[in-house]
């Protein structure tokens, strides 16, 4: 008797990547069903969020492929485990990455549990551009084949057990191939542009959105030399390395370097700026990271040479990691790096393999 095909639940977002993922899995002989997750309740009456349109697109794709689409509402889990933490970080003057939190708490936790327990799935699948491979009996995370679209940075919190239960069909393809497949199949999502912005904000204006949940606290903008040159509307609206939107004009006569945010003094509600994108105050020799997640789930001890990204789409930076204690590491860069931002994630790689990462707690200044 032949074994019945394994059941996969694909997280259908209404985008092209998850659409093609579902079709690819059908071709590979899996029993495929879709699941649309609603993670945010629109309470503002304005059609900021495209959830309804995305659901309609996901349904149209599932109809075309002849697969069932389930829907689930994870808005409560999202609010408690992603959004509240996101606001807390902003209040503390840090710059969090909600997409990483969403993958950790919703897509590879709430969704994984729901698919297995309620829908009887053997696997879940998503449209992420990453690959998985087994190394010494443990599933490991690799960068996506399309270096331009690789999303391993957002998935570093996943452990080998979660990866073992997850499939990433488009991770083996390049984006133009994915669009071509969707076009050839006549899928409604073939030409849909990639979603940008944070999942719960959609394309809406970030400043307006944040201002609804956190009261703005205006304060001084001060240069590294201590001169007051303007007022900011709230530290939460600014991130290290930012140049636009400071409201202090570029330069007096156009000949000087523009102003960049180089630091935040949270205690005194002061934004600190300097001229030039390579100003020493903007550069770091390394960082301290905490809340570590290693894909192999082995504790890190000792020292390791590898590469790191301190933000998405950054070129890999050669570095050395030193264990400080169970949940903190010191990372020393081979060369100084600009705009290392507390609250963001530092993600480590050995070649194609994503090793894991942690939250940047502090940056290490250049030693003069």
Curated annotation (Swiss-Prot):
The entry's ATP-binding residues are 11-18, 37, 127
Give the record's keywords alphabetically: ATP-binding, Cytoplasm, Disulfide bond, Nucleotide-binding, RNA-binding, Transferase, tRNA processing, tRNA-binding
Give, as one word, the top-level EC class: transferase
**Where found, per UniProt?**
Cytoplasm
**Reactions catalysed according to its record:** S-sulfanyl-L-cysteinyl-[protein] + uridine(34) in tRNA + AH2 + ATP = 2-thiouridine(34) in tRNA + L-cysteinyl-[protein] + A + AMP + diphosphate + H(+)
Which EC number(s) does UniProt give? 2.8.1.13
Per the record, the domain of life is Bacteria
| Alphabetized InterPro entries for the sequence | MnmA-like, MnmA-like_C, MnmA-like_central, MnmA-like_central_sf, Rossmann-like_a/b/a_fold
Q: What is its main location?
A: cytoplasm
**Function according to Swiss-Prot or TrEMBL:** Catalyzes the 2-thiolation of uridine at the wobble position (U34) of tRNA(Lys), tRNA(Glu) and tRNA(Gln), leading to the formation of s(2)U34, the first step of tRNA-mnm(5)s(2)U34 synthesis. Sulfur is provided by IscS, via a sulfur-relay system. Binds ATP and its substrate tRNAs.
What does the subunit comment say? Interacts with TusE.
Family, per entry: Belongs to the MnmA/TRMU family.
Name under which the protein is recorded: tRNA-specific 2-thiouridylase MnmA
**What is the organism field in this record?**
Salmonella arizonae (strain ATCC BAA-731 / CDC346-86 / RSK2980)
Gene symbol?
Answer: mnmA
């Amino acid at each position: 008797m032949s074994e019945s095909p394994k059941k996969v639940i694909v997280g259908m977002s209404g985008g092209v990547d998850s659409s093609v993922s579902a079709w690819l899995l059908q071709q590979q002989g899996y029993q495929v069903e879709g699941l649309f997750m609603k993670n945010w309740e629109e309470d503002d009456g304005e059609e900021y969020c495209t959830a309804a349109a995305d659901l309609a697109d996901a349904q149209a794709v599932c109809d075309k492929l002849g697969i069932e689409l389930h829907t689930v509402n994870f808005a409560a889990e999202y609010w408690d485990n992603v959004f509240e933490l996101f606001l807390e970080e902003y209040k503390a003057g840090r710059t969090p990455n909600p997409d990483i939190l969403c993958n950790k708490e919703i897509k590879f936790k709430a969704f994984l549990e729901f698919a297995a327990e309620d829908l009887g799935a053997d696997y879940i699948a998503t449209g992420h551009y990453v690959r998985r491979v087994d190394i010494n009996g443990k599933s490991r995370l690799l960068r996506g084949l399309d270096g331009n679209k690789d999303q391993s940075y957002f998935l570093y919190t996943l452990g080998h057990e979660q990866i073992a239960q997850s499939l990433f069909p488009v991770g083996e393809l390049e984006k133009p191939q994915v669009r071509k497949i969707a076009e050839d199949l006549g899928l409604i999502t073939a030409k849909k542009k990639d979603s940008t912005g944070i999942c719960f904000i959609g394309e809406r204006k970030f400043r307006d959105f944040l201002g609804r949940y956190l009261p703005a606290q205006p304060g001084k903008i001060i240069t590294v030399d201590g001169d007051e040159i303007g007022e900011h509307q709230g530290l939460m609206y600014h991130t290290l390395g930012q140049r636009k939107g400071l409201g202090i004009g570029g330069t007096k006569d156009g000949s000087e370097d523009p102003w960049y945010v180089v630091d935040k003094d949270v205690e005194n509600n002061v934004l600190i700026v300097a001229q030039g994108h390579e100003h020493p105050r903007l550069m770091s020799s390394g960082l301290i990271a905490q809340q570590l997640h290693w894909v192999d789930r082995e504790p890190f001890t000792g020292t390791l040479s590898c590469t790191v990204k301190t933000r998405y789409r950054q070129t890999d930076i050669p570095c050395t990691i030193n264990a400080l204690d169970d949940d903190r590491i010191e990372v020393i860069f081979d060369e100084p790096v600009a705009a290392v931002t507390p609250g963001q994630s530092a993600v480590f790689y050995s070649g194609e393999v994503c090793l894991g990462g942690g939250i940047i707690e502090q940056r290490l200044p250049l030693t003069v």
